[in-house]
From Swiss-Prot:
GO terms for cellular component: endoplasmic reticulum; endoplasmic reticulum membrane. This is Putative phosphatidate cytidylyltransferase. Keywords: Endoplasmic reticulum, Lipid biosynthesis, Lipid metabolism, Magnesium, Membrane, Nucleotidyltransferase, Phospholipid biosynthesis, Phospholipid metabolism, Phosphoprotein, Transferase, Transmembrane, Transmembrane helix. The keyword Metal-binding does not apply. The keyword Transcription regulation does not apply.
Length: 439
């Protein structure tokens, strides 16, 4: 019995000793893991600050590139927009790509890029014809390309269509047709919409820069107002957006956007349309400003004059009324382009469209609202602001494209007789020489 008791004591001592060893090991391991946890927390604390620094640096770098292009002239802005187009197209196409399948379908990637080049050729050709056709009328090589631009573009597209059908491979039909549809949707939303932004640019830098500026302004102030006052969520697809930020961004965009526009409208380099891509901020532009930039006197209704003790008339440029509409669309409608992009990212379970801009994600993440806003400004400008007039270039365009050689000679003779009858005798020798050369 004594031996059994001593054995039990020894066993209990061993068990207690083992427990002590385990406790010592646990305490030792806890001591070793504490520094690791602290290091991890420090690294997590540093990460947001590093991301903020990277984001800030790239923000100023992008602003520098953008304003440099603006100063260098319209051609460089068009080039910048083209680079953005290609970058966004690449990011969106990459979402639906499946590398393992594309290895078996080597033509898929080529066809995607071929359709992009064909669409760019058509879009830029349309813009060049609309705004710079007078530069190509006298060029015997370029004139046929301008005259038959749409037919050439269509035939280039047909070549791509035939290549796609010829590349169809058994077992991959569904994937290939989904790629075909995805490519055309991307071309419509990216190249199609940015085409109108370039047309805005040719109507005057004002109509390009102001919408871009409004979207950026709304993005910044919607974020700040949401951080300070945000309580009610706005839309499910983008949970961080709030009603307070949405409305606060709109109010701030209307006010600050009007101040920015007030400064820009005093520079003809911004408000004048361009018909020469070699212009820059240093060469300047000269034109008769659009009437929306000129002050108009408006009569205030008597009800408001009596109620609020306002003056009977007010002098104001009509552009401010249009800018209020631009700011409203940029703040309340254009963000839905961003919500559309957010929904697309959630559908494909990705955080960003790419990593081309460190700290910001991809180009698509920054341009999702700009494209939709650019289309609206173009449609609004052409409907309510653009001044329709016939220029010398338009008349020459009609004479070259619509009249036969005999009719063109008759036009010159009639124009000569008209000018001579009005005392412009100096043109007689010039016209006579031209007619002799033509005959």
């Amino acid at each position: 019995m004594a031996r059994k008791r001593t054995n039990k004591r020894n066993n209990s001592d061993k068990e207690n000793g083992n427990v002590g060893v385990v406790q010592n090991k646990d305490s030792a391991s806890s001591k070793t893991t504490e520094p690791a946890r602290l290091t991890k927390h420090k690294s997590l604390a540093r990460k947001p600050s590093q991301n903020f620094i990277t984001r800030t640096i790239w923000t100023f770098l992008l602003l520098g590139i953008f304003f440099t292009a603006l100063a260098m002239g319209h051609f460089w802005v068009v080039l910048l927009v083209t680079i953005v187009q290609i970058g966004v197209y690449k990011e969106v196409i990459a979402i639906a790509s499946v590398p393992s399948r594309e290895k078996d379908l080597p033509w898929t990637r080529f066809i995607n890029w071929y359709f992009l080049m064909t669409t760019l050729y058509y879009a830029y050709g349309e813009s060049i014809y609309a705004y710079f056709h007078h530069l190509f009328i006298m060029d015997s090589f370029m004139l046929p390309l301008v005259l038959h631009h749409r037919f050439i573009s269509f035939m280039l597209y047909i070549i791509g269509f035939v290549l796609f059908v010829a590349s169809l491979k058994k077992g991959n039909y569904k994937f290939q047709f989904s790629q075909f549809c995805w490519t055309h949707m991307t071309l419509l939303l990216v190249v199609g919409q940015s085409h109108f932004m370039i047309n805005n640019l040719f109507e005057g830098l004002f109509w390009f820069f102001v919408p871009v500026c409004y979207v950026v302004c709304n993005d910044v102030f919607a974020y700040l107002c949401g951080k300070m006052f945000g309580k009610h969520p706005l839309i499910q697809v983008s949970p961080k957006k709030t009603v307070e930020g949405f409305l606060g961004g709109w109010i701030c965009t209307v006010v600050i956007g009007s101040l920015i526009s007030y400064v820009l409208m005093h520079f003809k380099y911004f408000i004048c349309p361009t018909r020469d891509l070699s212009t820059s901020a240093f060469s300047g532009l000269n034109c008769t400003p659009n009437s929306v930039f000129l002050p108009h006197t408006y009569t205030i209704p008597a009800v408001f004059v009596d109620t609020f003790r306002l003056p009977e008339t007010i002098t104001l440029a009509p552009i401010y009324f249009h800018l209020a509409i631009f700011a409203t669309f940029s703040s309340l409608i254009a963000p839905f382009g961003g919500f559309f992009a957010s929904g697309l990212k959630r559908a494909f379970k990705i955080k960003d469209f790419g990593a081309s801009i460190p700290g910001h994600g991809g180009l698509t993440d920054r341009m999702d609202c700009q494209f939709l806003n650019g289309v609206f400004v173009y449609m609004y400008f052409q409907s309510f602001i653009a001044e329709k007039s016939t220029s010398v270039a338009d008349l020459l365009d009609t004479a070259v494209y619509s009249l036969t050689t005999t009719q063109q000679v008759q036009l010159v003779e009639d124009l000569q007789n008209y000018l001579i009858s009005h005392g412009k005798t100096s043109v007689q020798a010039i016209c006579s020489k031209l007619l002799q050369n033509s005959k």
